[in-house]
Amino acid sequence: MEEYHRHCDEVGFNAEEAHNIVKECVDGVLGGEDYNHNNINQWTASIVEQSLTHLVKLGKAYKYIVTCAVVQKSAYGFHTASSCFWDTTSDGTCTVRWENRTMNCIVNVFAIAIVL
């Protein structure tokens, strides 16, 4: 039996397209807001859900993982890292960094190609 492999439009993950989608979602949720601990759960849930919805609507053969962290600005800063073991020709990631005067937001998108 011959196997058929579809590799996400044969060009790999479009990180710029994903970055633009996520940035719009973050701007829509956090734009104009000041840090408020009581709103963090709602904000982060909205950002990941909206981002995921828009990414899936692209209709590409990927499974997506979206993470979001929002932290209050302070003198201590904010550092994060991630690592993946995957097929770099078809899978990909993008990170969106967003900030205003009161908070920082980091959103990571991991896209894993679905091979059929």
From Swiss-Prot:
InterPro entries: Tctex-1-like, Tctex-1-like_sf. Belongs to the dynein light chain Tctex-type family. Homodimer. The cytoplasmic dynein 1 complex consists of two catalytic heavy chains (HCs) and a number of non-catalytic subunits presented by intermediate chains (ICs), light intermediate chains (LICs) and light chains (LCs); the composition seems to vary in respect to the IC, LIC and LC composition. The heavy chain homodimer serves as a scaffold for the probable homodimeric assembly of the respective non-catalytic subunits. The ICs and LICs bind directly to the HC dimer and the LCs assemble on the IC dimer. DYNLT1 and DYNLT3 compete for association with dynein IC (DYNC1I1 or DYNC1I2). Disulfide bonds: none annotated. Pfam families: Tctex-1 (PF03645). The keyword Cell division applies. Its main location: nucleus. GO terms for cellular component: cytoplasm; cytoplasmic dynein complex; kinetochore; mitotic spindle astral microtubule; nucleus. The modification 3'-nitrotyrosine is found at Y4. This is Dynein light chain Tctex-type 3. It is found in: Nucleus; Cytoplasm, Cytoskeleton; Chromosome, Centromere, Kinetochore. One of its GO terms (molecular function) is identical protein binding. Acts as one of several non-catalytic accessory components of the cytoplasmic dynein 1 complex that are thought to be involved in linking dynein to cargos and to adapter proteins that regulate dynein function. Cytoplasmic dynein 1 acts as a motor for the intracellular retrograde motility of vesicles and organelles along microtubules. Probably binds BUB3 as part of transport cargo. Required for the efficient progression through mitosis. Keywords: Cell cycle, Cell division, Centromere, Chromosome, Cytoplasm, Cytoskeleton, Dynein, Kinetochore, Microtubule, Mitosis, Motor protein, Nitration, Nucleus, Transport. Gene3D superfamilies: Tctex-1. The lineage of its organism: Eukaryota, Metazoa, Chordata, Craniata, Vertebrata. GO terms for biological process: cell division; microtubule-based movement; positive regulation of mitotic cell cycle; regulation of mitotic cell cycle.
